[in-house]
Amino acid sequence: MSNEVVLKEENKLEINFNPYELALVKGDLSKLSDVERASYVKNLCESLSLNMLTKPFEYIVLNGKLTLYANKSATDQLRQIRKVSITKTEVAQVGDIYMVTAYAATPDGRTDCDTGALNIKNLGGDNLANAIMKAITKAKRRVTLSICGLGMLDESELETIKEKRFL
């Protein structure tokens, strides 16, 4: 792979990545053809031992970049394949924010934790119960991705992002 390096005005260096490098380095899949995108997703699934037929990743346009996010299928499979255990959860409420911290461990002794938080202002009854369950789910999915070394969005985080478009 070769990058085109161009010296721009005011001695600013610009690197023009080819489409596959953009996907790998910048996380932008928009310049890939349909076939290249399918290949990228297939390779990602294979590298993580995920079943591609279960659609563990979905596309989203975020900040002008076409990217992938991990859905429930991805995090459920990752927990099973990597034998990730959610060892405990802790709950806290700060003002109108309901926070759940999930702790995870792997058989080799690695541990991690991550938090899911939701605004519960003006919620009651079933809406409050659903928000609490969402915060738990968000924390568990986030810690799963984290302990597996994947710095990517999961679907439980998407509703709080305003500038997004699903494909």
Indicate residue ranges for each PLM-predicted region.
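Polyanion-binding surfaces on beta-sheet-dominated domains and ring/shell assemblies
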Residues: 2-167
